[in-house]
């Protein structure tokens, strides 16, 4: 697919970013299992290393198989380019490390995945980068948190595990008025199927590709997508590294050389070069296989999740249901506005009782797997209080939307009647009714 003529998601997931090799005519994307690439001559190698010419040098920076994956995700999300990473946490780390340095800060929603919260709250302060967490969804609280050292606003498209959908357009407006980018973790957006944050003002999108993009629980990976819309030159006071001469490349000026692709270029030629958190071609091929059925799976995931949510709402063993498609959800209006192809593939419930009751229900499941992943074709459940958010303090867990009685469920594509039956038998064992 040399030129992106077709724009529909279901077509892009199969064709974007790849044209059959002219020699082999392989219809499937080959796995280029190579560490490095030959140069035409020494002058060619010098041009590549000096970024005067773009091309393959070393697979830590770029690889033909990984390149197809990157182009495909960029097309699905509506970005100009993408960079793949070894995991979602790596994608997040490299993004923030590119935007901020010691003395800077990030403003972030407190409604975050536990691993993300820890990275922002514990790891980055070791490098001198602090995070100001906004516990409410109020726009004025985001404004109040921003200062001269703020380098980005960070939110999740649907927070994990309480599925808060932020006011993207409102937050993006605030970010841009202050000369900073909006970064959105769109992992729960399923590769752009449920929502494309860039269409609503996001400047940078990150994913754990391990989840719905891969879709089968086989492969760890991440990806960063650049919208190409943020004007780094206009805001050079906050981001001098984007416009001033780079000591890494003999005074090269990124904005002058790469324009709208400045950010994603720095991710590739500095962060992947120096940190090394790259995606292997084998992992890229597995993720590409997953992408080919992403739209089909996401549609079924959303249908099953809605039916399961309605079952839980009528269950005497469930105190509450958190699902963004429910009118009782605090951000239902925003979910209805932004999620145009279904309300996602996850929900959380509060079971009658305390933490021990939640663990008992999860332990009693037979079909639904008890594990820490989400976004698998198979249904998964976990007790976040004692697992994914266990490293947080009690106050931090509550601020993240995690309670003792919560069970987080990633709804698979099995027949929904069997998923319901599994919870029913577990409830009977746990409660005797």
Swiss-Prot record:
Do you know which Gene3D superfamilies this protein is assigned to?
Aspartate Aminotransferase, domain 1 (3.90.1150.10), Type I PLP-dependent aspartate aminotransferase-like (Major domain) (3.40.640.10)
- What use has been found for this protein in biotech? Fusaric acid is phytotoxic to plants such as cotton and banana. It has been shown to induce programmed cell death in plants. In addition to a mild toxicity to animals, fusaric acid exhibits acanthamoebicidal, antioomycete, and antimycobacterial activities.
Q: What induces it?
A: Expression is positively regulated by the secondary metabolism regulator LAE1.
Pfam families noted in UniProt:
Cys_Met_Meta_PP (PF01053)
Cofactor(s) this protein requires: pyridoxal 5'-phosphate
| N6-(pyridoxal phosphate)lysine, modified sites | 211
GO process terms (BP): cysteine biosynthetic process from serine; L-homocysteine biosynthetic process; transsulfuration
Q: What is its EC number?
A: 2.5.1.-
Q: What InterPro entries does this protein map onto?
A: Cys/Met-Metab_PyrdxlP-dep_enz, Cys_met_metab_PP, OAc-hSer/O-AcSer_sulfhydrylase, PyrdxlP-dep_Trfase, PyrdxlP-dep_Trfase_major, PyrdxlP-dep_Trfase_small
Q: Could you tell me one molecular function GO term of this UniProt entry?
A: pyridoxal phosphate binding
Top class in the EC scheme = transferase
> What pathway annotation does it carry?
Mycotoxin biosynthesis
- Asked if the keyword Transferase belongs to this entry, the reply reads yes
Q: Name one GO cellular component term.
A: cytoplasm
User: Any idea which UniProt keywords this protein has?
Assistant: Pyridoxal phosphate, Transferase
Physiological role: Sulfhydrylase; part of the gene cluster that mediates the biosynthesis of fusaric acid, a mycotoxin with low to moderate toxicity to animals and humans, but with high phytotoxic properties. L-aspartate is suggested as fusaric acid amino acid precursor that is activated and further processed to O-acetyl-L-homoserine by cluster enzymes aspartate kinase FUB3 and homoserine O-acetyltransferase FUB5, as well as enzymes of the primary metabolism.
Q: Which family does it belong to?
A: Belongs to the trans-sulfuration enzymes family.
The molecule here is called: Sulfhydrylase FUB7
Its gene name is FUB7
């Amino acid at each position: 697919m040399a030129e992106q003529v077709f724009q529909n998601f279901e077509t892009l997931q199969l064709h974007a970013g790849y044209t059959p090799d002219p020699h082999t005519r392989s219809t499937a994307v080959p796995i280029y299992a190579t560490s490095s690439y030959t140069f035409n001559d020494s002058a060619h190698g010098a041009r590549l290393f000096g970024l005067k010419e773009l091309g393959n040098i070393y697979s830590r920076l770029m690889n033909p198989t990984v390149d197809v994956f990157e182009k495909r995700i960029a097309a699905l999300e509506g970005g100009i380019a993408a960079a793949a990473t070894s995991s979602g946490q790596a994608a997040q780390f490299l993004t923030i490390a590119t935007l901020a340095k010691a003395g800077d800060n990030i403003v972030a929603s407190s409604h975050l995945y536990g691993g993300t919260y820890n990275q922002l709250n514990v790891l980055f302060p070791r490098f001198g980068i602090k995070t100001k967490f906004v516990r409410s969804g109020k726009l004025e609280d985001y404004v109040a948190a921003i200062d001269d050292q703020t380098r980005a606003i960070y939110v999740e498209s649907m927070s994990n595990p309480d599925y808060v959908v932020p006011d993207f357009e409102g937050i993006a407006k605030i970010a841009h008025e202050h000369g900073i980018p909006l970064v959105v973790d769109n992992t729960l957006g399923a590769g752009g199927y449920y929502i494309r944050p860039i269409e609503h003002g996001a400047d940078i999108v990150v994913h754990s590709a391990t989840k719905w993009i891969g879709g089968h629980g086989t492969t760890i990976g991440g990806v960063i997508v650049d919208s190409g819309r943020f004007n780094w030159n206009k805001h050079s006071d906050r981001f001098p590294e984007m416009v001033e001469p780079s000591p890494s490349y003999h005074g090269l000026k990124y904005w002058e050389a790469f324009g709208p692709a400045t950010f994603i270029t720095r991710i590739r030629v500095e962060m992947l070069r120096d940190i090394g958190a790259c995606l292997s071609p084998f992992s890229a091929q597995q993720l590409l296989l997953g992408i080919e059925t992403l739209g089909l799976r996401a549609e079924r995931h959303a249908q099953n999740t809605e039916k399961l949510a309605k079952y839980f709402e009528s269950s005497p063993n469930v105190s509450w249901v958190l699902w963004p498609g429910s009118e009782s959800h605090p951000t239902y209006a925003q979910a209805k506005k932004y999620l145009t192809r279904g309300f996602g593939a996850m929900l959380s419930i509060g079971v009658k009782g305390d933490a021990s009751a939640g663990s008992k229900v999860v332990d009693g499941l037979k079909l639904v797997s008890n594990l820490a992943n989400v976004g698998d074709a198979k249904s998964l459940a976990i007790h976040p209080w004692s697992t994914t958010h266990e490293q947080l303090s009690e106050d931090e867990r509550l601020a993240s939307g995690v309670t003792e009685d919560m069970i987080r469920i990633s709804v698979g594509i099995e027949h929904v009647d069997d998923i319901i039956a599994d919870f029913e038998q577990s409830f009977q064992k746990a409660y005797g009714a």
